[in-house]
Curated annotation (Swiss-Prot):
The lineage of its organism: Bacteria, Pseudomonadati, Pseudomonadota, Gammaproteobacteria, Oceanospirillales. PANTHER family: FE(2+)-TRAFFICKING PROTEIN-RELATED. NCBIfam families: PRK05408.1. This is Probable Fe(2+)-trafficking protein. One of its GO terms (biological process) is cellular response to oxidative stress. It comes from the Bacteria.
Amino acid sequence: MANTVFCKKFQKEMEALDRAPLPGAKGQEILQNVSKQAWQEWQHLQTMLINEKQLNLMQSESRKYVMEQMDKFFNNEATDKLAGYVDPDDIKEL
């Protein structure tokens, strides 16, 4: 049986990550408090934010922005919206 964690994003016991996704204390915090599903959803949003806002992760401001958005996402706070993005689940067939 897979390891589980109480996910702070979904507020329930869910499948845990296999290993810390980031180095250091932040990675351990995520490993102990974020489910595999929440991490995958964050990676999807992170990719969209980086692409839409044309972030250069070599710049400290961009890395700081991404980390702030990640914290907001996992704490169920509002994250920045992407201009013109429509969730595929919201599209109704014509």
